[in-house]
Amino acid sequence: MLAKGHRQAAEDIEKTVIPLQSTPYAARVVIEGAWGAAFHWIAYGCATKHQKHQDSHSRLGRFLRHLGEGTVARWWEDLDLVRQGGWYGNNTDPTAAQHALEVLEHIHTWALS
């Protein structure tokens, strides 16, 4: 996928999950959506800033550190932990969903900067 496609995917996912943030039973979907949108924003940001990106979330933190994007790597790894707790575990409260959206906002801002 090209940078433009990653940006469109991120924007589409954000438009879908942000309205759900106030729906308590939607926390799992909000967290997963924030994670997915963040992945696409990272791909977009890497493509536009470094002329390369990774099409897999596997070892994405390592890839980002190699590019000198340590802060983004930490945001990604934080969000990945929230996702694991939200999707596979019991951490599905609105606070976790809100945290996921806050991390997404940081990544979104970085990608467009």
Residue ranges and their predicted role:
Residues 1-113:
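Terminal alpha-helical segments
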